[in-house]
């Protein structure tokens, strides 16, 4: 239950910090869409609906600004949420059979995302 509270607070924080533009992708959308990945990334459950969330996110990230927002949010989440297996996070594109134009990692330079 404590983890759910942390995730809810993180999503709320992202929604406040990243002011939405006209139909621009928000950090709240990124974290909400990828919430099904959390049990898998923490070694507490199967992949489940994670790939569907990843594919929806990719479909929503239509512009360079959207992709940079997604990258920044993923990077922040990787740093903020305890117990994430960073190797599993980096492997999500391969497991879900999608192409993400950057590595999912706390060390990713999101300013280079196109």
Swiss-Prot record:
Residues 1-23 form the signal peptide. Induction: By salt-stress, mannitol or ABA in stems. By heat shock in seedlings. Keywords: Disulfide bond, Lipid-binding, Signal, Stress response, Transport. SMART domains: AAI. One of its GO terms (molecular function) is lipid binding. Disulfide bonds join 27-73, 37-50, 51-96, 71-110. One of its GO terms (biological process) is lipid transport. Belongs to the plant LTP family. This is Non-specific lipid-transfer protein 1. It comes from Solanum lycopersicum. The lineage of its organism: Eukaryota, Viridiplantae, Streptophyta, Embryophyta, Tracheophyta. The gene is TSW12.
